[in-house]
């Protein structure tokens, strides 16, 4: 199955809908990236909410437009809150996205993520090692870092997408987005995106928010990946290093004009 290059014209159209809807996105994410994730969503036009207590997480997941579950700093109590939120989202038909951070490196989070899969995530976003581990095809990875190229994990992503009936995103130098039948490739970005903490986690939040949009989920999620790649490229051109990249990246998301990027690339 050959990946198709994602159409930036479609990404531009999807971004207009995204900004008009401003999806209320319930982010149960890790402690390291809370602020960056919220600012990324705000810069693009979404409405983030970082609700984590189990008493609040269950009812809030039912009223949000989308839910993100990121297991980066998983604890037993946080797992209980996440499970409650996912069960509520499932009952309310709120689309939820799983970011299985370091799932191949630690057994507790691997079992937790596998236990959530029957509750039908709308999307799963991970690096190659994480997707391989979640699919059962490999275990390993250096914590949150990948030891595999994204393309190497594509067969696992396609099989997982068919098994769960969801969208699976494998991120890397080129991102691959698949529903198991059709696969889209999104090149771009910049190496500076790997020199700061949180770009992958923030992408998962944007993917989650995009799942709230009407239309084809595959195209919406691929558009989310395209937005982040374009913003990363634009920010890198204005940055001297990781310290100046972060504010430049948020500015690039805020001013993102995919149609203008099409005209100059």
From Swiss-Prot:
Needs which cofactor? Mg(2+)
Q: Report the pathway entry.
A: Cofactor biosynthesis; thiamine diphosphate biosynthesis; 4-methyl-5-(2-phosphoethyl)-thiazole from 5-(2-hydroxyethyl)-4-methylthiazole: step 1/1
Q: What CDD domains has UniProt attached to this entry? A: THZ_kinase
Positions binding substrate in this chain are 50, 198
Where, in this chain's numbering, is ATP bound? Answer: 125, 171
> Which keywords does this chain's UniProt record carry?
ATP-binding, Kinase, Magnesium, Metal-binding, Nucleotide-binding, Thiamine biosynthesis, Transferase
Which Cys-Cys disulfides exist here?
Answer: none
Q: Does the keyword Metal-binding apply?
A: yes
Annotated EC: 2.7.1.50
Catalytic activity field: 5-(2-hydroxyethyl)-4-methylthiazole + ATP = 4-methyl-5-(2-phosphooxyethyl)-thiazole + ADP + H(+)
Question: Which GO annotations describe the biological process of this protein?
Answer: thiamine biosynthetic process; thiamine diphosphate biosynthetic process
Query: Is the Acetylation keyword given for this protein?
Result: no
Pfam entry (one): HK
GO molecular-function annotation terms?
Answer: ATP binding; hydroxyethylthiazole kinase activity; magnesium ion binding
The family line of this record is: Belongs to the Thz kinase family.
Q: Function of this protein?
A: Catalyzes the phosphorylation of the hydroxyl group of 4-methyl-5-beta-hydroxyethylthiazole (THZ).
What name goes with this protein?
Hydroxyethylthiazole kinase
- Annotated organism of origin: Salmonella heidelberg (strain SL476)
Gene of origin?
thiM
